[in-house]
């Protein structure tokens, strides 16, 4: 039986791994830069999950548990907090990799609970876990009286179909990291 719970800092390593799966390898390597590896990037992400002032914080994360094993996660936060929460990532990448990511595009804004990262372990896909994580996150959005918003890769129609089936609707085209995306929202 899969349970959805608030994340704990002790789950940071697996949450970081799952977030990196959601980002994809090329994106992670871009953020780490040419002189560093995705293992280096994982160390940074783990440290960001362990913090409370990061967009990737465990405090912003729901996990799917199969027994005690984390098999999925969904990271979300109030879009109004993006710039403040992103500072930990910017400072961390600068310190760890000498990379300046302070000019990143904004993927969200005030007025929505932004679903930053959603991932399910390969061994547990196809069991409705992503749907359960999204439904729990949408309940969080409802409690905050905000629509839930996300960006979906224009090259991932299967993900967009899942979001549409769950009530997410197209808002506008977007770009993130020079990548064409679609901004979707689910109203409260």
Language-model-detected regions and their locations in the chain:
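Conserved N-terminal entry element of GNAT/NAT acetyltransferase domains
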Residues: 1-10, 28-30
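Conserved beta-strand in the GNAT
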Residues: 63, 69-78, 114, 119
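Conserved GNAT-fold acetyl-CoA-binding loop/helix
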Residues: 26-49, 60, 94-95
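A short helix-loop-beta-strand connector motif used in the catalytic cores of GNAT acetyltransferases and
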Residues: 50-63, 80-84, 114
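Conserved acetyl-CoA-binding loop-helix of GNAT-fold acetyltransferases
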Residues: 126-139, 161-165
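Conserved catalytic-core motifs of GNAT/GCN5-like acyltransferases
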Residues: 79-81, 149-152, 164-183
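Conserved acyl-donor/pantetheine-binding loop and adjacent beta-alpha core of acyl/acetyltransferases
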Residues: 78-117
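Conserved GNAT acetyl-CoA-binding A-motif
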Residues: 112-113, 125, 141-153
């Amino acid at each position: 039986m899969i349970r959805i719970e608030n994340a704990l800092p002790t789950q940071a390593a697996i949450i970081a791994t799952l977030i990196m799966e959601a980002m994809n390898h090329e994106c992670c390597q871009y953020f780490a830069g040419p002189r560093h590896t995705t293992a280096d990037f994982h160390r940074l992400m783990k440290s960001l999950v362990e913090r409370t002032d990061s967009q990737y914080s465990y405090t912003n994360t729901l996990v799917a548990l199969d027994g005690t094993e984390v098999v999925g996660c969904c990271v979300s936060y109030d879009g109004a907090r993006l710039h403040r929460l992103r500072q930990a990532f910017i400072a961390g990448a600068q310190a760890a990799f000498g990379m300046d990511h302070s000019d990143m595009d904004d993927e969200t804004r005030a007025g929505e609970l932004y679903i930053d990262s959603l991932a399910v372990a390969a061994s547990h896909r196809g069991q409705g876990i992503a749907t359960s994580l999204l439904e729990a996150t949408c309940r969080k959005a409802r409690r905050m009286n905000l629509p839930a918003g996300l960006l979906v890769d224009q090259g991932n129609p299967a993900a967009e179909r899942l979001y549409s089936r769950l009530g997410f609707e197209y808002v506008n085209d977007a770009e993130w990291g020079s990548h064409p995306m679609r901004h979707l929202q689910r109203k409260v």
